[in-house]
Amino acid sequence: MKIMFISLGCDKNLVDSEVMLGLLRDRGHMLTNDENEAEVIVINTCSFIHDAREESVETILEMAKLKENGKCRLLIVGGCLAEKYKDEIFKEIPEVDAVLGTTAYDRICQVIDEATEGKRPMAFESIDRLPKGHVRRVITTGGYFSYLKIAEGCDKHCTYCIIPKLRGSYRSVPLEDILTDARELAAAGVKELNIVAQETTMWGKDIYGEKRFPMLLKKLCQVEGIEWIRILYCYPEEITDELIQVMAEEPKICHYLDLPIQHGSDAILKRMGRRTSRKELEEIIGKLRTAMPDIALRTTLITGFPGETEKDHEELMDFVEKMDFDRLGVFTYSPEEGTPAQKMEGQIPEEQKEERRDDLMALQQGISEENSRKMIGRTLQVLVEGRIPEEDVYVGRTYRDAPDVDGYIFLGA
């Protein structure tokens, strides 16, 4: 059968989609990117915030039309939206033939078989399950970079976050499975590994009784063919001196860190259930910059959190200005059903959230422009990813640019 995948949401979800594609390829199915040719359409959904849920539902409804107007015979929904709203999906969207949860993606072949027989399967496993066995996945990112997922789930339980309920507790992928994945990616021509998980720096704690992320990084640096290793999703309180030392000493590890801090006001950090104070964040960032003066730091913030006063917003603006982040993204707070923050007093109007977000982005724009000017005259290695024929230029990234979220370098032909 011809099967098409639509992967929504984060890069961790994309890795799950690539694993499912690998299973289907090994089963003999044909893969296609043409929705008008697909006999089976699988949508791997996101449900992290309200906007993500809307996008997921809109995509399902759009693809459902192809059961009447195209060749589509089966419409299958997986991922976080399916995990949370499986009954509602079946009830409200009768065109959906099967749903599978976040820890049951390795059952995709079975689900398609059952749906082909006219059943309407619901494939779900324990939320704390980690699918076993390695699968050679299908690379969908273009060939030169890929995401390497090293863990599933999260134990942090921030007051605004639904992820532990959708993805379960923290489970590390075994070392040999990670290394096998990395070697296969390298053999396929991948030059850059982007390390992802809900939280990367906790890796190994559930296997060894202690964090072993620095050890894992050293092992990955030994994989032949890999030139860059980029670390994403690092919780600041888990950054140790050992990790900083490994980053500084290993030439393959990019001097780049994705460090989600969420806020700069101690009062809001406490309400969020975060585990670092503003002072501690400043100390951690100071250590990173002392060890690696050329490090590029990316962070994400949430504005409009319940109880956020004008003073809290000003403290966050001051923090952003002083920390001089190279890359920064801002989300307006999205109340999630079943989280403590949803029930907190002091909910902020949407208009005010957006105004505060715009303040932060305007501030960061000036910081980013100044940091870009500082790069003039420097010589940097660029990973060239493609060419724009009509403009006769090549497109690539430096160590300072993570795929999908940061900028690009344009090179004259």
Q: Which residues does each PLM region occupy?
A:
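Short glycine-enriched, charge-decorated loop/helix-capping segments at active-site entrances
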Residues: 47-48, 167-168, 207-210, 270-276, ...
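Short, hinge-like loop/turn segments at secondary-structure boundaries
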Residues: 93-94, 115-118, 211-213, 247-248, ...
